Amino acid sequence: MDELAFGEAALEQTLAEMCELDTAVLNDIEDMLQLINNQDSDFPGLFDAPYAGGETGDTGPSSPGANSPESFSSASLASSLEAFLGGPKVTPAPLSPPPSAPAALKMYPSVSPFSPGPGIKEEPVPLTILQPAAPQPSPGTLLPPSFPAPPVQLSPAPVLGYSSLPSGFSGTLPGNTQQPPSSLPLAPAPGVLPTPALHTQVQSLASQQPLPASAAPRTNTVTSQVQQVPVVLQPHFIKADSLLLTAVKTDAGATVKTAGISTLAPGTAVQAGPLQTLVSGGTILATVPLVVDTDKLPIHRLAAGSKALGSAQSRGEKRTAHNAIEKRYRSSINDKIVELKDLVVGTEAKLNKSAVLRKAIDYIRFLQHSNQKLKQENLTLRSAHKSKSLKDLVSACGSGGGTDVSMEGMKPEVVETLTPPPSDAGSPSQSSPLSFGSRASSSGGSDSEPDSPAFEDSQVKAQRLPSHSRGMLDRSRLALCVLAFLCLTCNPLASLFGWGILTPSDATGTHRSSGRSMLEAESRDGSNWTQWLLPPLVWLANGLLVLACLALLFVYGEPVTRPHSGPAVHFWRHRKQADLDLARGDFPQAAQQLWLALQALGRPLPTSNLDLACSLLWNLIRHLLQRLWVGRWLAGQAGGLLRDRGLRKDARASARDAAVVYHKLHQLHAMGKYTGGHLAASNLALSALNLAECAGDAISMATLAEIYVAAALRVKTSLPRALHFLTRFFLSSARQACLAQSGSVPLAMQWLCHPVGHRFFVDGDWAVHGAPPESLYSVAGNPVDPLAQVTRLFREHLLERALNCIAQPSPGAADGDREFSDALGYLQLLNSCSDAAGAPACSFSVSSSMAATTGPDPVAKWWASLTAVVIHWLRRDEEAAERLYPLVEHIPQVLQDTERPLPRAALYSFKAARALLDHRKVESSPASLAICEKASGYLRDSLASTPTGSSIDKAMQLLLCDLLLVARTSLWQRQQSPASVQVAHGTSNGPQASALELRGFQHDLSSLRRLAQSFRPAMRRVFLHEATARLMAGASPARTHQLLDRSLRRRAGSSGKGGTTAELEPRPTWREHTEALLLASCYLPPAFLSAPGQRMSMLAEAARTVEKLGDHRLLLDCQQMLLRLGGGTTVTSS
């Protein structure tokens, strides 16, 4: 390290001597700068040339300003500085070259930048002030001098090559500086520092240690605090003989280059302020305040306050940036999920993110599975073709269609993959694991997809089918039928042949009118041989003409679609798309796809009334011909009489496919999903039926039976009542079709073979609706199958019949147990129908029949089990009831979610009756009564919510209300002493019921009275339960006897006078009669009994009735009471 040329003592002495001069000079400079800043117009020549320089550059001697004539001499300035400092200047080699990036510095055009002249020597000393930045003024604004309150503190900093600074401090723009970012506000340095403060700072430099020799050359660093603004200052020491004061306005748009600053990293952001000048002892010190970004300074030079403020700002900025990134990230995810939803389920669907991702995963798995099947099929077809020789392939192509693979022989899943459907934005997938309400497909924005990859290598090129394979239109068919009918009725050939034979004779007679009559007679005798030969020839010609017409209609007029041909590919494509649309619920689009599928098969639907009439007439004629087996045999020869067996098989398969599509369109029409009148629907039904019969063994018997039943539905719906006998014919054909092949009827149609179901279908008053109403007693089946809706109506009919057997049995029932046995029979049939019918469990596929898409109906099964349990309780068959407890305890979820209170009333009534009818409990627990009260509350809510409900609702409400009353009565009777004791002692009534039990009984009785106002059969139970309530309350027995007498006498006079009155008032049943006898014999006082032995006779009659009803436990009780009354004798039934 080189020795310094001066010491600290010399610097302090020099500064002390010049203190007074410095103070005076600084005051003058401040006044002059104030005058210049406030009145620029008073010095017009000061900002003119040669001071006005428009360019910026280095502040060294090479600057353009050095050539100005009014510049100071650099040599004189250097000599003065050396004389002043007292030693030569040592300039070591720089450690590293400074960066050359310019800093933003803009000069006013009227002010020339300060440039040292030849006699002026410039020494840049960078000073770094490390404080947080303050707001930055706009460029080009002239800043007035500011005088901060606190003095500027200059930290000790080593100065290389100088003993001290003469006065003031100055700075210039360092090289390679940049404007700080807009997010980091900077404040300008003060324009002019106060003289005392500046003088104090300069004096404090004398006590600092010099820099070591290894420091950067010509570089000094001074740390200060000026209004919390980071400033980099580089001083210029100027010595002149005369005082020259200049002030230069700077701007951020200009750039100033310097040699470099060792304490600043390259790229430091700076800000230029107004140029400041300081004159002291003939030396001019020009300074330019700069603003330096604190982030570019060394960490160890940052002040504590700067660190705290900088870290707070950094955290806020990082948090803001993090939030912005997170927002963009979430927005990107949401956009992609929305796009994925549009691809998977379409734009109309509303799903959450989880459901969209789940469906996308399911569809991806489906695509992977499909690709796997396609690869396997491709390998199979490749191996099949490789096994054939070239000769076989050529011969197969020459024979026509030899390489076609039968569509019927393939597996269903292979057929599905061979002709994939078109994919649109909302289509679901073919067989998603979520079954068919949640299927999805990928969106391609196009109407169709390319053919399946399974045919890329093995599919035979579609051959151009012959014209006869395309089929005939229905108008042409009807014209041929009319021609054949005319040939059989009008016999035009006979007239034609007769005219041809008689023409020669007539001609000869005309030319020989004057001839002899004997010759004419001879000529006529010669033509007699044609008279007996002409009729057979004419009829033979007519027969041949009719056979030709039939052959054209059935054999050569039927369109035959060969597998893998162009029409077949289009057909399967539209059919699979129709399956997807049906699964998605887009029924109009599905009908459109089915229409296109029929058009691809060469069977377009009629588009005008004339076409519709022709098509309907042709289908009627064809069905009549097929009933005669002529049309069916001819249809079996479709494609040509001399064709091979493979073509006939393809013809049957084509007829099967067309029949299935016609059948599905008919179902859509029946459910209101396809437009058209009754004639169009009848035409669809007949077309499906005729083609299904022509398909032969190519169609399954279940599908054929379903088509027959659909035709019977159409007869019942569209035809007048006089033609409803055709319904029986079609149902019989369906049953024969099933029994002929397998000997069994599909589960979904077994109820049609039952007498009750057959009678309901033929004679029932029902109708198929497009939007069936919601029901509590059965779930809806396939929404596009009318037979499923009829089956649902039949299940509800069975439940209603079972309830009516209890509520209003037939008046001619001689057997008392018949009402219960009939009800249990209906319920058993309902259980079997519920096991085989319900919501679809497979698919909505066009080819799927009802037999393959049925499932259990848990709702109907639950109601049937509940009703059966109540009937077993009324019969006092507790063992049979206990077997059904598990089925009733688990209520279906559909009934739990409903808002109607009737299912909850049924469930709590079952629980309450189960607790109260338990004969092992003599006393009632509060919990049992609480459940009973809850059931009563739900029942009252049900009566209030459905004042005009259906008959099945009222029958179920009557059953539940009667069950609660019977359960309360049974509990009260168990709490009584034995009836024999009461009778022996002649008591009139037993102990009364508690207030809680009596209040609950009155509430249920009020519900029964309210129900009886709209449901007449409930009136019988009102009389009996009202008499029971009076007995429980201990009321006057007179009114009780009248109420019991109504139930006793109505049974005796079954055909009494006033038949109209008897019909209006419902007749009591055997069960009600028995209950009235027991109540009268056990609880009425002896005064109300007409004869002494009447009580015993009443008990004997009750015992006989109970025996008919099958209540063995009550029969045993009656016999015990008779034993006590008769003194050891028993009374049996006679």
Curated annotation (Swiss-Prot):
Changing residue 389 to A: Abolishes AMPK-mediated phosphorylation. The modification Phosphoserine is found at residues 96, 115, 331-332, 389, 395, 448, 1047. Induction: Up-regulated by endocannabinoid anandamide/AEA. The gene is Srebf1. Disruption phenotype: Mice show high embryonic lethality around day 11 dpc. Surviving mice show a 2-3-fold increase in processed Srebpf2 protein in liver nuclei, 3-fold increase in cholesterol synthesis and 50% increase in cholesterol content of the liver. This is Sterol regulatory element-binding protein 1. Changing residue 354 to A: Does not affect AMPK-mediated phosphorylation. A motif (9aaTAD) lies at residues 27-35. Residues 46-73, 130-149, 170-195, 415-468 are annotated as: Disordered. Residues 59-69, 170-179 have a biased composition (Polar residues). Residues 317-367 form the bHLH domain. Residues 1-477, 558-1134 are cytoplasmic.
